Amino acid sequence: MTSTETMDPLQQVPQGVESAFPAAEYDARQAAVRDRMRARGIDLAVLTGPENIFYLTGQQTPGYYTFQALCIPAEGAPFLVLRGLEAMNAKLNTFLADLVGYADDEPPAAALAGALRDRGWLGRRIAVDRNAWFLTVNLHAQLVAELGDLGDATGLVEPLRRVKSPAELEQIAAAGRANDAGMRAGLAAVAAGATENDVAAAIMGAAIASGSEYVGMEPFVTSGPRSGVPHTTWRRRRLQPGDVAVLETSACFNRYHAALFRTVAIGTVPDEVHEMYAVCMEGLDAALARLRPGNTCADVHAAAQEVIDRHGQTAGYRKRTGYSMGISFAPDWGEGNILSLFRGIDVPLEPGMVFHVPITLRAWNRFTVAVSETVQVTDGAPRTFSDIPRDLVRL
């Protein structure tokens, strides 16, 4: 038996060498969360959402389908409870000194309770993020059985993620470049006789070759009547003359995403396709003109909605005008749980916020036309993260 076979596997992994950011970036984020915890009377916050865990530590793994819990004390060092198999990944991606791995036959709630007990946290004011997708009702009940009453840490981290730091904006810009590569390849692959699968393969291959990691949600590649049904995507359909093909793509760089919509007319299409696309372009221009400090998220939606309504297209636009972008893991590529551009969202816009602004109009079960940009709020005109022309592509 060699010496390496007897070593703790965790000791063979270097600390933080694959982290997206330096330790100082996470230290500042954790300090901001602690300020919010103290204001809410929380001694220890237990966070289970992969996006918030990544934001505060850099931890990323496709294995987030197993329970992981970042424990942030109001005073003291954080620790991460996770499946033992993932502990090496956490060391590689984070600067956390305290990693608690549990075995596959150990109940996660018991593992978390044991970690808290060992560190003297039982009986203190512990709060969990009740809105996290990966905290099931059953698991929450098990935690209460182990730990007693738990406070609510919902919304503790998300407001801090609204405005992106310069380092975060660099990641989104890199995602935008990879996404442009994917979109260009997808547009080039659209042709009568090609399949939706051909187009999707071109998009994903080019984006990955240009630096994208696995994305939070698959691209949407849909054509013909299928495109008139929201969120249909590739399913082997062969493109035909007269089809409208709609591509919505994203790419990811260090878990930060950028997304984009473009539309293709294959041969001769009905006049209303061109008319509706012109309305989309006008709606996007109106939204982007309002996307600046001094306005609210609701103001941006109202600007786009006014264009839609004025052109008699209200029935085909039953949605928000946009959503925030940044850190994502499946099942979504956006941060729509943080901010939406929609009525009633009276949050003021600030420089550094990033949104995907998709303007889509649907002739239900006939076709869809759509155009979008991922954009950053600045002190002036918004910054876009794509160089691809917005015009309807005509083949």
Language-model features: locations:
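Active-site neighborhoods and metal-handling regions in enzymes and metal-associated proteins
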Residues: 1-395
